[in-house]
From Swiss-Prot:
In this strain lipid A lacks phosphate groups, instead contains a galacturonic acid moiety at position-4' in place of the monophosphate group found in E.coli. Its EC number is 3.1.-.-. It comes from Rhizobium etli (strain ATCC 51251 / DSM 11541 / JCM 21823 / NBRC 15573 / CFN 42). One of its GO terms (biological process) is lipopolysaccharide biosynthetic process. This is Lipid A 1-phosphatase. It is found in: Cell inner membrane. Belongs to the lipid A LpxE 1-phosphatase family. It holds the Pfam family PAP2. Disruption phenotype: Lipid A contains a monophosphate group at position 1. Retains 4'-dephosphorylase activity on Kdo(2)-lipid IV(A). Increased sensitivity to the cationic antimicrobial peptide (CAMP) polymyxin B (PMB) but not other several other antibiotics. A double lpxE-lpxF mutant contains lipid A bi-phosphorylated at positions 1- and 4'- and has greater sensitivity to PMB that either single mutant. No visible effect on free-living bacteria, or on nitrogen fixation upon nodulation of P.vulgaris. Its main location: membrane.
Amino acid sequence: MPPLRWQACLFITINAVALSMLLFDAPVGASERPAAVKELGELLTGFGDSAWLICISILLFFQGKAGYKLLKTARSKAQALYVSWIGAYLFTTVVFSGLLANLLKRAIGRARPDHFHDYGMFSFTPFSGHAAFESFPSGHSTTVGAFFAAFALLFPRYRVAFIACAIWLGMTRVMVGAHYPSDVIAGLAFGGWFSLLTAIVYARCGLLFKLAPDGWPLAKRLFPDIEKPGAL
C-alpha cells in the first residue's frame, strides 16, 4: 500500500472519529431529533441495507456469468467476465467488512444513543449479547462505505457522487437515532479501507485492478465508453 496515502488517510480517519466523539456525539445523544429529520432518515436508511447490496452483487455476478456463456465475441465475453468479477468483488467487500464490523461492535460494546441518559456516550459493555450495546462502529455504515468505495475505485470519474451517497446513507443512522456520528464515521472509514485492501488483493491476482507504480489499485479499462466524458 502506498505509504503516504494510507498514513494520511488513517490520520484523517482517527481525528475525524475523535473530534466527532468530543464535539457531536453528546449533543446528538442528549437531543431529540426533529420528526421530519427522523422520517427522512427512516425513508432513506433502507437503501443502504446490506441485503440489498448483497443482492446487487449476486445479480451482477450471475448476469456476468450468463453473458459469458451466451455471448459470442471475445470482447463481449471479456466484458461479461468483468461484470461477474465486479459482482464477486462487491460481494467480498460488503459481506466480509460487515461480518468484521459486527464482531468489532460486539467486542467494543458501546451503548447506543437511545441509552445516552442512562449510560452516557462512553459506556462500554463488551459481548453483552444485546443490540443496545453494539453501537461502534455502525455495521450499516460499514457495508455502505464498502459498497460505494468499491464503486469509487472501479469508476473513479464518479467517486464524488459515490462518496456523497455513502455519507448520506451512513448519516441516516444518526437521523433515526441508531448511532452516534462517530459510529457512522468509523463504519464508513472501515468499509472504505476494506474495499481498498480487497482491491489491492484483486490487483495482485490480476483481477479487475492493476497496481500503479505507487501501489494504488487502478481499475482496468475494459469499458472504454464509460471513460468518455458525459458517459453514464
